[in-house]
A protein has these predicted regions:
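Residue-level signature of mid-helix packing/kink "hotspots" within the transmembrane helices
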Residues: 31, 58-66, 151-152, 261-269, ...
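Helix-to-loop junctions at the C-terminal end of transmembrane segments
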Residues: 64-76, 267-280, 365
Length: 403
C-alpha cells in the first residue's frame, strides 16, 4: 500500500507532468531528422545521403546505450538526460547551419545519436525505477505518448516554416531551442526524482554486462526486444523518407505526420489503459496485423489525401499501441533483477532498426525506387507479425500440453 501512495499525490503527478513535458521538448530533435531528405534534396543531395546521416547516429547510440547506465550511476538519470539534451541542441544547430551533405553533417549525426540514445534509454528506466510493475505499461504509454508528440511536431514545424516562407532549416533551430529548454527542466526536477526513488525503494543498478545481456537474451524478453527492432525499422523507413513518398504521389507529407501522431498519441493515452488489461500476446498479434494493413495501403491504395491520412492513422494505431505493449513485456518478462538491463537492450534494438534501416532504405530508393522500399518494409512487417503470432500459438500449445 505504501508503494502506491506517493504516486497518487498531487506533487508526484506534477513531477511526472514535468517529466513528460521535458520529454516532449527533447523529442522534437529526432522528429526533425525526418526533414533531412527534404533539406538535402533542395541542396543537391539524395535519399541515400539522408539515410547515411541518419544511420551514422546508430554508432553513437550504441555507446549511449552501453554507457548510459554507468553515467546514471555517477550523476543520476535525470542529469544524464539533461546532458543528452545539450548534445541534441548542438546537433540541431549543426543541421541548421550545414544544409549540404558532407563530413560535418555526419559529425552532427553522431552527436544527435548520442544525445537521443541517452534520453531514449534512460527515460523508460526512470519510469521503471519509480513505478511498480503492475502500473508500468500505463506510465510507459504516457511517456511514449509525450515523446511521440514531440517526434511528430518536428516535421510539422518544418512544414509550417515552409508555409510561412522560411527555409526548412528553421525547424532545426526550433528543435534546438526546445532541446535546451527540455535539458533545463530535467536538471531542475532531478532532486525531486531522486527523492521519489528514495521513497519507493533503492535504485536498481543500470550497468549492462555480457553476463546480464546473455541472461536477458535467453529469457522471454528476447522476443519483444527483437520485435521493437523490426518495428523501429518500419517506423524509421517510412518516416525518414515520407517527404519523398509524398512528393512522388503529389501529396502533403504533413498529412502523414499529423495522422500518425494523433492516432499514436490518442491510442497511447486513451486506449493503452484498456489494452493493458488484455492479453499482451494477443494484443501484439492484432496490433502488428494493423501495421501490415497500413503498409499494404501505402503500397497499393494510397491515391488521395484521404487514403493517405487513413493509412497513416492505421499505422499510428498499430505502431503506437504495439510499442507500449512490447515495452511492458520487455520489462515484465526480464529475469529477476535485470529489468533495467532488459530495457537497455530494448532501446538498443530499437535504435538498430530506427537508425540503421534508413541507410539501407535510402540506397534502395536511389537504386530501385520507392516501390521497392515499400515491399522491403512490408516484408519486415510480415516477419514481425509472424513472431507475434508464433508466440501466441506456442503459448497455446504449451498450455494444452500441460492440461
Amino acid at each position: 500500500m505504501s508503494s502506491q501512495a506517493p504516486e497518487n499525490t498531487p506533487s508526484t503527478k506534477g513531477l511526472f507532468g514535468l517529466f513528460c513535458l521535458a520529454s516532449y521538448l527533447l523529442s522534437l530533435s529526432y522528429g526533425t531528422t525526418f526533414l533531412l531528405a527534404l533539406m538535402l534534396g533542395s541542396h543537391g543531395g539524395s535519399e541515400s545521403d539522408a539515410g547515411t546521416v541518419i544511420s551514422v547516429a546508430m554508432l553513437s547510440t550504441f555507446l549511449a546505450v552501453i554507457f548510459s547506465g554507468h553515467l546514471t550511476d555517477i550523476i543520476g538519470a535525470p542529469r544524464a538526460i539533461a546532458a543528452g539534451g545539450l548534445t541534441l541542441m548542438i546537433a540541431c544547430i549543426g543541421f541548421a547551419m550545414t544544409p549540404t551533405y558532407g563530413p560535418a553533417l555526419l559529425i552532427f549525426g553522431l552527436i544527435l545519436g548520442f544525445g537521443w540514445g541517452v534520453f531514449y534509454t534512460l527515460g523508460p528506466i526512470i519510469v521503471a525505477m519509480i513505478i511498480e510493475p503492475a502500473r508500468r505499461v500505463k506510465y510507459f504509454a504516457l511517456l511514449s505518448g509525450s515523446m511521440m508528440s514531440g517526434i511528430g511536431t518536428g516535421p510539422l514545424a518544418g512544414r509550417g516554416a515552409v508555409a510561412m516562407g522560411y527555409p526548412v532549416e528553421s525547424a532545426f533551430v526550433v528543435a534546438a531551442a526546445a532541446s535546451l529548454l527540455g535539458a533545463v527542466v530535467f536538471f531542475l526536477i532531478a532532486p525531486k526524482i531522486r527523492l521519489q526513488q528514495a521513497v519507493l525503494g533503492p535504485v536498481a543498478v543500470c550497468r549492462i554486462t555480457t553476463g546480464a545481456a546473455a541472461r536477458v537474451i535467453r529469457s522471454k524478453a528476447f522476443f519483444p526486444i527483437v520485435m521493437v527492432g523490426l518495428g523501429g525499422a518500419i517506423f524509421g523507413g517510412l518516416s525518414s523518407f515520407q517527404t519523398s513518398y509524398a512528393a512522388l504521389h503529389h501529396l502533403d507529407y504533413s498529412l502523414f505526420f499529423l495522422g500518425f501522431m494523433c492516432a499514436a498519441i490518442s491510442c497511447r493515452l486513451l486506449i493503452a489503459g484498456f489494452i493493458v488489461k488484455r492479453d499482451a500476446y494477443l494484443s501484439s498479434c492484432v496490433l502488428t496485423s494493423l501495421m501490415i494493413v497500413s503498409i499494404l495501403m501505402f503500397v497499393f491504395s494510397v491515391e488521395s489525401p484521404f487514403s493517405y491520412l487513413l493509412a497513416a492513422i492505421i499505422l499510428g494505431v498499430g505502431y503506437g499501441l504495439t510499442y507500449s505493449v512490447i515495452n511492458g513485456l520487455a520489462a515484465n518478462e526480464a529475469p529477476n533483477g535485470l529489468t533495467a538491463q532488459s530495457l537497455l537492450l530494448f532501446s538498443l534494438s530499437y535504435f538498430v532498426g530506427v537508425f540503421g534501416f534508413p541507410l539501407l532504405a535510402g540506397k534502395i530508393i536511389v537504386a530501385y525506387g520507392m516501390p521497392s522500399l515499400l515491399y522491403t518494409i512490408l516484408s519486415v512487417s510480415l516477419l514481425n507479425g509472424c513472431i507475434a503470432l508464433g508466440r501466441l500459438a506456442w503459448r497455446k500449445v504449451a498450455v494444452a500440453a500441460i492440461a
